[in-house]
Amino acid sequence: MKEEREKKEEVFEEEEFGELLKYTLAGYAGGLGLGWLLDKLGFQQNPIGEWLVRTLAGEGESILEGIFAVKKRLTGAVSSLAQAYGWGKLIGMTVPWWIDLFSRLLGVNVYGWEGFYIPYFYAMSDQIGANVSGFIYLYKKEGNFSKAVKRYFTNPVMLTSLLVILLVPIGLLVARLLGFSPTTNFYAALETVAANLCWLPPLVGMLVEKKKGSD
């Protein structure tokens, strides 16, 4: 009975991680497209414009993934790691809005190296939320903290997520120190897209589930 349930979950997760990957690409396209349009309209270095393009480029998929998780819950689908991932991303997506706002109010140069953390949180706060939510899912499934930790560090999706969370801020800081400055909406979107490696964990999840299915 347990093996049958686990196989059913694997089928769901392969399909669901594939959907999450599509949502990420849609967010990229939306952010870059809106950035280009706002620049054409003359809204460079506009806080609201930058908020919109960073939200779409870094978190557009979170909105769609949150809707995906709600839809799956309402239809009574089997609870899965992909759904937990979607819920976590939706919850974490508002954090960078406040970080961006208070950074500007405090006079931080958001276009210099000092503001490297702003695109990081737009790109990664939902990923951090997804990582935490994924661990909670594993804990509930295992019913034991030490077993959940063991599952976490043997789960390729969770490990990829953790690696992305730790490496992205280093890349952003280096780029800013080398002279990159997001002075246009398109550049702001491009920087956020480059930092938004949230597609990697779903891709790993999809590939792993496909490999399991072929074995």
UniProtKB/Swiss-Prot annotation:
UniProt subcellular location: Cell membrane
This protein's GO CC annotations: plasma membrane
Keywords per UniProt: Cell membrane, Membrane, Transmembrane, Transmembrane helix
Membrane topology: Multi-pass membrane protein
Listed transmembrane segments: 77-99, 117-139, 152-174, 189-208
Transmembrane keyword on record: yes
Protein name: Uncharacterized protein aq_473
Organism: Aquifex aeolicus (strain VF5)
